[in-house]
Regions:
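A ligand-binding cleft/hinge motif common to bilobed small-molecule-binding domains
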Residues: 102-108, 222, 226-246
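Periplasmic-binding protein-like
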Residues: 126, 140-143, 169-179, 201-204, 210-211, 280-302, ...
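Short amphipathic alpha-helical coupling segments at ligand-binding clamshell hinges
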Residues: 57, 199-202, 259, 268-280, ...
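A bilobed periplasmic-binding-protein/Venus flytrap-type ligand-binding module shared by bacterial periplasmic
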Residues: 144-151, 188-189, 257-269, 288-289
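Extracytoplasmic ligand-binding site segments that recognize negatively charged/polar headgroups
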Residues: 45-58, 70-87, 91-225
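Short, polar/charged alpha-helical segment
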Residues: 28-43, 47-68, 145, 239
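Extracellular/periplasmic bilobal clamshell ligand-binding domains
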Residues: 303-338
Length: 338
């Protein structure tokens, strides 16, 4: 009896220890929900360009709270200009914005955002991804290497970013343009920080073929026109399922962009905005992201993630862009990759 009791106590203590660090989803504040429902709607500004998993996240909010979401979904550069124009004219239409972290920091510095007033589910964020009183992480876009499995044998697959320097890949690397904003520039910055300029000089000597037509370039690799492509968005790889391609996660880790959310200055529906941002840190939305090949910012979602997505969502993060060095990095890329 005593032994059984001791074992039971030990098991309960172990279970309690396992739960430490995994903060449960926070209960909705009934006053916030009531105020948000009274506002009835919100305007959401983003640049995911119709990706179905993003639409699913929006619909989950509308279904749960009965609050409609008016969506502005345009390219990042167009989005930034839209906000500048509206706010300069004193027309405050948008409530919530979601964009890359570096761009969001610029928006905050330019006075385009305001404090969100508290997000209960921010307590759930992983230790590496922290919220501020203005910016709240929502998900992570990560990049690896795409290879054509018919052209590249298993033993020849690049396991490291440095494997791209192998002479066998000369004139055979299809790459997003590192000299312009986008995935290529993110990769350039992160690998410059990790390996230094000599790495890029050697990679430039491989004569990578630059392009900015992401969807078509992925298909070119699938067709066998090129054996590999860098950098490859994790989430885009899911679209290529059934084709002779494979995503490689290099041993050093992967470049990434974190997408943050914030309330726009003088948001006309501030309570709905807070509730919306909070919803994006719920299990429901984080699992939508995880099962689409994005990395969630809330840990311990565990068994609900599809088996084929677990390697992607648990990939080691190598680094991301720095808003204060972004322009210098772009200039350096143009200098090295002529």
């Amino acid at each position: 009896m005593i032994r059984i009791g001791l074992r039971l106590i030990a098991a309960m203590m172990a279970l309690g220890a396992m739960s430490v660090g995994a903060t449960a989803q926070q209960a909705d504040d009934p006053d916030l929900v009531a105020a948000a429902k009274k506002e009835g709607k919100l305007a959401f500004y983003t640049s995911f360009l119709g990706a179905p998993f993003h639409i699913a996240a929006i619909k989950s909010f509308e279904k749960k709270y009965g609050i409609s979401v008016e969506l502005l979904d345009v390219r990042a550069s167009e989005l930034r200009e839209r906000i500048r124009t509206e706010q300069a004219a004193g027309r405050f239409i948008g409530d919530v914005i979601q964009n890359g972290a570096a761009t969001m920091i610029r928006s905050q510095r330019d006075g385009e955002l305001e404090p969100h007033g508290g997000i209960a589910n921010a307590k759930r964020l992983s230790g590496e991804q922290k919220a501020t009183d203005v910016l709240v992480p929502s998900y992570i876009l990560a990049y690896g290497i795409l290879v054509n499995t018919a052209k590249v044998k298993g033993e020849d697959e690049p396991k490291s970013w440095k494997d791209l320097l192998d002479p066998a890949w000369k004139d055979k690397i299809l790459s997003d343009d590192m000299r312009a904003l986008g995935g290529g520039q993110v990769m350039f910055s992160v690998l410059e920080d990790a390996f230094g300029r000599p790495f890029h000089e050697k990679l430039a000597a491989q004569q990578p073929i630059f392009s900015r037509d992401v969807g078509n370039d992925e298909r070119r690799v699938a067709r066998g026109e090129y054996p590999l492509r860098i950098p490859q968005l994790f989430s885009n790889t899911t679209i290529l399922k059934g084709l002779p391609v494979k995503l490689i996660i290099p041993v050093e880790g992967v470049p990434y962009i974190r997408f943050d959310m914030a309330r726009l200055r003088n948001a006309p529906h501030p309570n709905a905005a807070r509730l919306f941002i909070n919803h994006y840190l719920s299990d429901e939305v984080q699992l939508i992201y995880a099962n689409a090949g994005l990395i969630p910012v809330v840990p311990d979602l565990g068994g609900a993630i599809k088996e084929e997505m677990r390697a992607l969502t648990s990939a080691k993060l190598l680094g991301t862009t720095n808003v204060d060095t972004q322009d210098a990095m772009m200039a350096l890329a143009r200098e090295i990759y002529k």
